């Protein structure tokens, strides 16, 4: 996939297949790029989100858009007694997730599934998580509705995502890095310029934190937001009413 045919950004019905193809192409180097491009800070973000997801001692947790399984593995290492299921619609990512979990001798179910049509019954998970995948959904409202549907009453949703850069000096510096430095590094390491041009574009097109919180409330969640690392990342926590 080239920069010219990278996925559309924002909440768009026609981007699902393009996103699927893009992540399939970068799967082998996805983890390395995450570490390099975030300077390793993404691990701390995942730890904070895992603590929220496990706060009420869930029995079953679904990690949506699990990718190569980093967050599902974080959850299982923190709570070995909890059943963890990782779902993604990119088979190449799931293959890597299974290899990583197997190397750590962790029992995690990784299953192929579309986040907009989750293949699970109503009220079947006590917590649902999504780390840096929600931004890639073709329909944010439908994605939230599906995650609400599979949660048990009182269950918790935790979203970890990149909000648009804030205003001010730090936001300007981060925007410069995100738009001009990150795509070059990503293209060099992955060989896919389109994927790492799409990333900053998708962040800039993503809803502001309060707007996403409002969408969650409209779906039926009691919602709160926490900025991480000066707002580079954000965590939305929603409890199903």
Curated annotation (Swiss-Prot):
Origin: domain of life: Bacteria
Binding site for S-adenosyl-L-methionine: 68, 88, 114-115
Pfam families referenced in this protein's UniProt entry, alphabetically: Ubie_methyltran
Gene Ontology molecular function: demethylmenaquinone methyltransferase activity; methyltransferase activity
Keywords, sorted A to Z: Menaquinone biosynthesis, Methyltransferase, S-adenosyl-L-methionine, Transferase
Biological process annotations from GO: menaquinone biosynthetic process; methylation
EC number(s) stated in the UniProt entry for this protein: 2.1.1.163
Family designation: Belongs to the class I-like SAM-binding methyltransferase superfamily. MenG/UbiE family.
Protein name: Demethylmenaquinone methyltransferase
Organism: Deinococcus radiodurans (strain ATCC 13939 / DSM 20539 / JCM 16871 / CCUG 27074 / LMG 4051 / NBRC 15346 / NCIMB 9279 / VKM B-1422 / R1)
């Amino acid at each position: 996939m080239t920069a010219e045919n990278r996925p559309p950004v924002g909440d768009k019905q026609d981007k699902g297949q393009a996103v699927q193809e893009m992540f399939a192409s970068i799967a082998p180097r996805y983890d390395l790029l995450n570490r390099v491009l975030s300077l390793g800070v993404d691990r701390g973000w995942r730890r904070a989100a895992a603590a929220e997801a496990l706060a009420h001692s869930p029995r079953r947790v679904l990690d949506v858009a699990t990718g190569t399984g980093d967050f599902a593995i974080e959850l299982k290492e923190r709570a070995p007694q909890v059943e963890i299921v990782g779902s993604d619609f990119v088979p190449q990512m799931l293959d890597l997730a299974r290899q990583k979990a197997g190397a750590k001798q962790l029992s995690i179910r990784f299953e192929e599934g579309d986040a907009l049509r989750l293949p699970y019954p109503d009220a079947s998970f006590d917590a649902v998580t999504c780390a840096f995948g929600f931004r890639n959904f073709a329909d944010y409202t439908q994605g939230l509705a599906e995650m609400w549907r599979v949660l048990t009453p009182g269950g918790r949703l935790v979203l970890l995502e990149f909000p648009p850069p804030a205003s001010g000096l730090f936001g300007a510096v981060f925007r410069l890095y995100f738009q001009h430095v990150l795509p070059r590094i990503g293209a060099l390491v992955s060989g896919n310029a389109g994927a790492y041009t799409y990333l900053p574009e998708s962040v800039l097109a993503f809803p502001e934190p309060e707007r996403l919180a409002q969408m969650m409330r409209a779906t039926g969640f009691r919602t709160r937001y926490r900025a991480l690392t000066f707002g580079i990342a954000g965590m939305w926590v929603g409890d199903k009413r």
